[in-house]
């Protein structure tokens, strides 16, 4: 089965072809970073229009790159949610229309399920069950995954997501968008112990809170009164986020008795987070798994693969084009 995956939940237009026998046949990705950079964040209307502009050219590029003919596509998977309404709708309309024209099934995929399953595309994929740490611009969650569609929420952020905190602090520091990679780069030359930023809710269950940390950084920047300590601020802020994510992940593994941790989402590319996770998990004889570097950020491959997992069980959507901008993973069902 060859599945076309379409990702348009935010500011990346990603398309990919997943072959159940040959694996990933090809993928293309267009980022809108330059478009949104001058605004310091994603402008939903601009994002939607840019998806419309790029979908057909990227589709043609993907088919040429992979050597797959449009008629060979067996099914279409598109991101149904969560995400920006307009952005989701462009991908859903494109995918549903294409599937209808080819007389093939289509299925709407949960964006974060795609991220969580992306490490299964690696050369050494994890086996179920595992704990998943999902960290992105819109989500920070710990899930126990027992199988496709069998997800138990262990903890989540009660306010800002980790990636959102990175972006907001970067904006405070006048760093370019996107904030996460730029803070990580600046942190390399800073002292992570220079400022003792709070780790809210560190010892309170498995939920997260990052708004207080963001406020603490804002207060510290005002105290510095123009003194350039940006590298130390970046390193200390990043350390507070990483410390919280690592300790909560270890706690989740101990609480569930599981020995495998999957980390997925854009923030999973953070090298300091990976380094600290590997060190901490080695102490409890647990393993950590990541997606391939190209699959950490939003992409079509994860949507194609997640869609395939459900399509092979006979699950697909009707003719109606549906999007779900707010969609808890716990509402997902087991494909039957």
Swiss-Prot record:
Catalytic activity: L-threonylcarbamoyladenylate + adenosine(37) in tRNA = N(6)-L-threonylcarbamoyladenosine(37) in tRNA + AMP + H(+)
GO MF, one example: N(6)-L-threonylcarbamoyladenine synthase activity
GO cellular component: cytoplasm
Keyword Zinc-finger on entry: no
Cofactor details (free text): Binds 1 Fe(2+) ion per subunit.
EC number, as in UniProt: 2.3.1.234
Primary site of residence: cytoplasm
Gene3D superfamilies: 3.30.420.40
Swiss-Prot/TrEMBL GO biological process terms: tRNA threonylcarbamoyladenosine modification
Keywords per UniProt: Acyltransferase, Cytoplasm, Iron, Metal-binding, Transferase, tRNA processing
Cofactor dependence: Fe(2+)
Binding positions (substrate): 134-138, 167, 180, 270
Subcellular location field: Cytoplasm
Coiled coil, from the record: none
Entry similarity comment: Belongs to the KAE1 / TsaD family.
Known role: Required for the formation of a threonylcarbamoyl group on adenosine at position 37 (t(6)A37) in tRNAs that read codons beginning with adenine. Is involved in the transfer of the threonylcarbamoyl moiety of threonylcarbamoyl-AMP (TC-AMP) to the N6 group of A37, together with TsaE and TsaB. TsaD likely plays a direct catalytic role in this reaction.
This protein's name: tRNA N6-adenosine threonylcarbamoyltransferase
Record organism: Acinetobacter baumannii (strain AYE)
């Amino acid at each position: 089965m060859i599945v076309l995956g379409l990702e348009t939940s935010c500011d990346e237009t990603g398309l990919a072809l997943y072959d159940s026998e040959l694996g990933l046949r090809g993928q293309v990705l267009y980022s809108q970073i330059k478009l949104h950079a001058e605004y310091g964040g994603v402008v939903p209307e601009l994002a939607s229009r840019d998806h419309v502009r790029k979908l057909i050219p990227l589709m043609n590029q993907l088919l040429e790159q992979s050597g797959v003919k449009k008629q060979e596509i067996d099914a279409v998977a598109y991101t149904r949610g969560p995400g920006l309404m307009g952005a989701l709708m462009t991908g859903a309309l494109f995918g549903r229309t294409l599937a209808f024209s080819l007389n093939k099934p289509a299925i709407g995929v949960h964006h974060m399920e795609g991220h969580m399953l992306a490490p299964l595309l690696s050369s050494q994929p994890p086996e179920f069950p595992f704990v998943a740490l999902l960290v992105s611009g819109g989500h920070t969650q710990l899930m126990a995954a027992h199988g496709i569609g069998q997800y138990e929420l262990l903890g989540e952020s009660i306010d800002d997501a980790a990636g959102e905190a990175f972006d907001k602090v970067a904006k405070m520091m006048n760093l370019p968008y996107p904030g996460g990679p730029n803070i990580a780069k600046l942190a390399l030359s800073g002292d992570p112990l220079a400022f003792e930023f709070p780790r809210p809710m560190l010892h309170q269950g498995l939920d997260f809170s990052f708004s207080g940390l963001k406020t603490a950084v804002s207060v510290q920047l005002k105290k510095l009164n123009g003194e350039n300590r940006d590298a130390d601020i970046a390193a200390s802020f990043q350390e507070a986020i990483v410390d919280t994510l690592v300790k909560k992940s270890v706690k989740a593994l101990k609480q569930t008795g599981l020995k495998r941790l999957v980390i997925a989402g854009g923030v999973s590319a953070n090298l300091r987070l990976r380094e600290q996770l590997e060190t901490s998990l080695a102490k409890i004889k647990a393993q950590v798994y990541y997606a391939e570097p190209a699959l950490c950020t939003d992409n079509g491959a994860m949507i194609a693969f997640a869609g395939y997992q459900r399509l092979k069980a006979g699950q697909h959507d009707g003719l109606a084009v549906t999007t779900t901008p707010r969609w808890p993973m716990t509402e997902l069902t087991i494909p039957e």
